[in-house]
Design a protein with these regions (language model features):
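Short amphipathic alpha-helical/adjacent loop interface patches that line ligand
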Residues: 24, 34, 38, 45, ...
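Alpha-helical residues within the helix-turn-helix
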Residues: 32, 43, 49-50
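Beta-hairpin "wing" of winged helix-turn-helix
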Residues: 50-60, 64-66
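Amphipathic alpha-helical dimerization/coiled-coil segments
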Residues: 73-100
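Absolute protein N-terminus
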Residues: 1-2, 100
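N-terminal helix-turn-helix DNA-binding core of bacterial DNA-binding proteins
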Residues: 2-39, 62-73
Length: 100
């Protein structure tokens, strides 16, 4: 999970993940939508792929990129534990405020 956070801490990589949430894209499409050169987009995709967040498949002369759900599901489970804790604390605070 640490590598996921480290990888997503770079703003362009987070933007790539947000784009791929809509569905698979080619490297060129990602570069165009983010205003990056293809080498820059490829560099970010290599980092995302190394972290297990993105899968890149070569089809003819195109590289199709798509999200890999498992690392994102692990983050969701981890965040859910915080959400549950905060919900309980906010409920107690709400009850306390009503008693006042």
């Amino acid at each position: 999970m640490n590598s996921t956070f480290r990888t997503l801490a770079e703003p362009n990589r987070l933007r790539v993940v947000e784009l791929l949430r809509e569905g698979p894209l080619t490297v060129g499409e990602i570069a165009n939508r983010l205003g990056l050169s293809q080498p820059q987009a490829s560099k970010h995709l290599r980092a995302l792929s190394a972290a297990g967040l993105v899968e890149v498949q070569a089809i003819a002369n195109r590289r199709i990129c798509k999200l890999r759900p498992l690392p994102l599901l692990e983050l969701e489970v981890w965040l859910e534990s915080f959400r549950h804790s905060w919900d309980e604390k906010l409920d107690r605070l709400g009850n306390y405020m009503q008693e006042l």
